[in-house]
A protein has these predicted regions:
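Terminal amphipathic alpha-helical/low-complexity segments used for targeting or macromolecular assembly
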Residues: 1-147
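Structural signal for interior beta-strand "rungs" in well-ordered beta-sheet cores
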Residues: 149-175
Length: 175
């Protein structure tokens, strides 16, 4: 038994420090709630509150990257800032995805319904966040995000995949 304990101890010493998968997923879910209030019961009362919430999410991303040993050589300040600079265009792609799902599914009653309830929208949206981090060279975190979406939706999209709008339409037909 002593060899077994020693083996487990050595494995634990070799584990790379990083936030838990749950904390990483919670960051993405929180960001989704900011982007799409349809997915959340919390609303903000001023533009300043929204701006502060996005700044907090950026700080949370920075801290998450800082706590990730595999990111020790990354320029985490630049990556965090670039992610949030690119967020408006990521958001626009997410809206385009939601519209494509709605247009491709005759059962969809509204954009609100697609955003709030469709697993395909959640999977693609989390992928969009993960892909931005993947593109910036962040290790492991993008895959954790897409695996979170996979666990919630059954839809597995690699964070490095390149999705075109035709993919969204085809996916709607398959789902």
């Amino acid at each position: 038994m002593e060899d077994f304990y020693q083996h487990i101890y050595q494995k634990q010493q070799a584990v790379q420090d990083m936030p838990s998968n749950k904390a990483i997923a919670q960051w993405a879910v929180g960001l989704m709630h900011l982007l799409f209030p349809e997915r959340n019961s919390k609303t903000f009362h001023t533009v300043q509150e929204i701006e502060d919430a996005f700044k907090q999410s950026e700080a949370d991303l920075y801290l998450m990257l800082f706590k990730t040993k595999a990111c020790s050589s990354c320029n985490i300040k630049k990556i965090s800032e670039q992610f949030f600079t690119n967020l408006p265009s990521i958001y626009e792609r997410m809206l385009t995805d939601a519209k494509a799902i709605m247009d491709g599914d005759p059962a969809a009653q509204s954009l609100n319904e697609v955003i709030r309830t469709y697993p395909g929208f959640l999977a693609i949206s989390i992928y969009r966040l993960a892909n931005e981090l993947w593109t910036q060279g962040i290790p492991l975190i993008p895959r954790i995000l897409t695996e979170y979406a996979h666990s919630k939706t059954g839809i597995d999209i690699h964070p490095g995949a390149l999705l075109m709008s035709t993919f969204i339409s085809i996916m709607v037909l398959v789902l």
